[in-house]
Amino acid sequence: MRVHFIAVGGSAMHNLALALHSYGHQVTGSDDEIFEPSKTRLAEKGLLPKQMGWNPECISQEIDAIILGMHARIDNPELLRAQELGVKIYSYPEFIFNHSKDKTRVSITGSHGKTTITSMILHVLQYHNVSTDYMVGALIDGFDTMVKLTDDEFIVL
């Protein structure tokens, strides 16, 4: 699958881009500004945009999906081009839902402790060699990214 991220530099967005790239998808992205650690992490995988800003010429019908970051404006030229071409556009939550709708989902909710509880569950599953997809609110020890998306049966969010 070929995926383009509009506003790839955010914490959640760049982790999703890294996850899709590591699973073998062709990933590109753009942003008007990218800060550390996103910048270095994207660069290490060859996903850092060559130039900052929006480039509607990089949007074509060859793209299977656009994932739209929260700070992308409604008049973003790449978004407008994708709409014009009829490319499927997802928000981050929509993309995660579509990927996980047929999986067994373990959802951690509440005001406090979501990342801690998710981390504990992931460590227990890892200890027992249970492969699972996940989305967690921070980078945790023993895991390379905040997001993992594969064909695994389970997802912890």
Predicted features along the sequence, with ranges:
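Phosphate-binding loop of NTP-binding sites
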Residues: 19, 57-58, 70-157
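N-terminal leader/targeting and accessory segments in enzymes
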Residues: 1-95
